[in-house]
From Swiss-Prot:
One of its GO terms (molecular function) is toxin activity. It holds the Pfam family Cu. InterPro entries: Cupiennin. Belongs to the cationic peptide 04 (cupiennin) family. 04 subfamily. One of its GO terms (cellular component) is extracellular region. The keyword Amino-acid biosynthesis does not apply. It is found in: Secreted. The keyword Secreted applies. Keywords: Amidation, Secreted, Toxin. Expressed by the venom gland. This is Short cationic peptide-4b. The modification Glutamic acid 1-amide is found at residue 20.
Amino acid sequence: FLAKKVAKKLVSHVAQKQLE
């Protein structure tokens, strides 16, 4: 199932947005 991969990408994306 891809949920874990997608979740990781989403977390990475959100984390980068919050860092800016």
